[in-house]
Swiss-Prot record:
InterPro entries: BTB/POZ_dom, SKP1/BTB/POZ_sf. Gene3D superfamilies: Potassium Channel Kv1.1, Chain A. The gene is btb2. It comes from Schizosaccharomyces pombe (strain 972 / ATCC 24843) (Fission yeast). GO terms for biological process: protein ubiquitination. This is BTB/POZ domain-containing protein 2.
Length: 284
């Protein structure tokens, strides 16, 4: 894509070559070359010279065009403010390019999480849902950490994880991720997979091990052994990588009204730490 030093789309006049279709002409002359642009769009300090006619396909940008040009001036200048770290220059370029196309598809080399973020920012629901679908299809044990980080960058807790940062498009992705983890733990447990659990937040491990959907053997002892192995590997991982401030985790057998199960125990760091006990199961 032709870009100058200010990351603006090139506005140099050029002789148009014959193209095979009007859509090709619009994309090449309009978006790539910025010919006859009438709108300056600013997103996170990056400037794009585009066309109000096509930007109007975004309900968010259309509203800004109307609000920022009450006198009907020939040229528009609009800005979209956001601090979302997933809104990047590359993702903005791709999403903006889709306004000049019919039925755009998200290429494999584009960060689909960033595409979802920009699509949500600009109110492009169809593209956002397509990005969400691609994220869901990409979920597997190896991608679990990045998916969870995308859903909840600050690890605010399970409620945020279940909804995600863009609830209309990300709610349900965490449940899908947990389901993949259930299936892997039950059918393909191995040391390599256990390592993938080392970096996940404790609340995620808790949710995984306490669920009735996780069937491990015929007794609570089998679940205890599995949970204990995971907790030990997480402790070893933190020690080897000098990760501090996470507190300690342990697993205990628990008895309640004749039934036996396990509990995951998390002891937070600091002098005022309190023991948090998470019930993982209640199996006889």
């Amino acid at each position: 894509m032709s870009m100058n030093s200010s990351t603006e789309i090139s506005q140099e006049p050029s002789i148009m070559k014959p193209v095979s279709s009007i859509s090709s002409f619009v994309f090449n002359a309009g978006f790539l070359q910025g010919t006859f642009s009438d709108t300056t769009l600013i997103i996170k300090g990056e400037t794009y010279h585009l066309h109000a006619l096509f930007l109007g396909r975004s309900p968010v940008l259309l509203q800004k065009l109307i609000e920022n040009n009450p006198k009907g001036d020939v040229h528009y200048t609009i800005e979209v403010e956001t601090e979302d770290p997933y809104v990047t220059k590359e993702s903005c370029l791709f999403v903006l390019s889709t306004l000049y196309c019919d039925s755009p598809r998200i290429p494999a080399e584009v960060n689909v999480c960033s595409v979802l973020a920009v699509s949500d920012l600009l109110g492009l629901d169809t593209l956002a849902f397509e990005a969400s679908s691609l994220i869901e299809k990409s979920i597997r044990p190896e991608t679990m950490e990045s998916v969870i980080r995308f859903l909840d960058p600050n690890f605010e807790g399970l409620e945020r994880l279940k909804m995600g940062m863009y609830p209309r498009f990300t709610s349900g992705l965490f449940n899908k991720a947990i389901q993949v983890m259930y299936n892997t733990l039950v059918s393909n447990w191995n040391t390599e997979y256990a390592r993938l659990l080392c970096n996940l937040p404790f609340e995620v491990i808790k949710d995984l091990l306490e669920s009735d959907k996780l069937t491990v053997g015929a007794s609570s002892m089998a679940r205890y052994k599995l949970a204990n192995e995971i907790v030990k590997m997480r402790a070893s991982f933190r020690k080897q990588n000098h990760i501090e401030g996470k507190g300690d985790e342990s697993v205990v057998l628990a008895f309640d009204e004749g039934s036996r199960g396990i509990q995951l125990v998390h002891i937070a760091p600091g002098a005022e730490s309190r023991r948090k006990i998470w019930k993982a199961t209640s199996v006889r």
